[in-house]
Structure formats: structure tokens, C-alpha cells
Amino acid sequence: MQKKEDNIKRHEIKFVFSDKNENKLLKNYELKKIFPDRIVESIYFDTSEFKFFHLSEEGVTPRIKIRIRGYNNGLFENLEIKKTNSYDRQKIVIKKFNYNLTDFYKNLKSFGIDGVFTKKLKVKYKR
């Protein structure tokens, strides 16, 4: 397993539009795709009371988000932990993560996250 921290400060704005409009925008503004299209799959974890979801919806800090994620292959190879507080956001990515409950909880505990979390939401989309 390989740990990577992404603490780059950024603000993202996301738009949804059709393939036709995407091609038009790329052409009209002479934009280039940085990455080829890919399938992103994520499984989000939460408590039985959906604590992480409610904290996020209410904008409460500190809060965390836990997910496993994969790209193009149906495998969930990355464990991602996002911690947000009132002054900072931290994203920890553990690459080549082989999902099993023992390693999952061991990794969370190493970052000070303790509790019982279950799979709550699976998301799949083309990026």
C-alpha cells in the first residue's frame, strides 16, 4: 500500500453537459482534455445514523468522508479519507488498497478514525 496526501488548496466548479456540447466547448475555446475519459466507481462509508452525510449537509466541521475508489476496471484500489475542519482540508489516498475489513479498520485507526462504518452508497460515472 502506498499513502499519498493531497493538501493542495483548490476550488472546483463542476458542470454537466452533453457530449455534443463538450466537443463544441473544447473546439471553441481551444481547450484540451488533460485525461482520457474514464469510468470512476466509488463506495462511500458512513455510520448507521449517516453521521458523515448529515455533518456534510449541515456544513459542520470538523467532518470526514471515507470512500474506496477505482478507475476503469471495477476494482476499488484506493482508500480515500477526507478530513475537513474550519481552516483546512486534507485528503489522504492509500493506493493499491486491497479491501478487507481488517485492513480497512486498521488504516482508519492509524489516522485517528474509530467506529463502525458500513457501505452506504455506490456511485459510478464517466469522467
Regions found by a protein language model. Give the residues of each.
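Phosphate-end processing signature that detects enzymes handling 5′-triphosphorylated RNA
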Residues: M1-R127
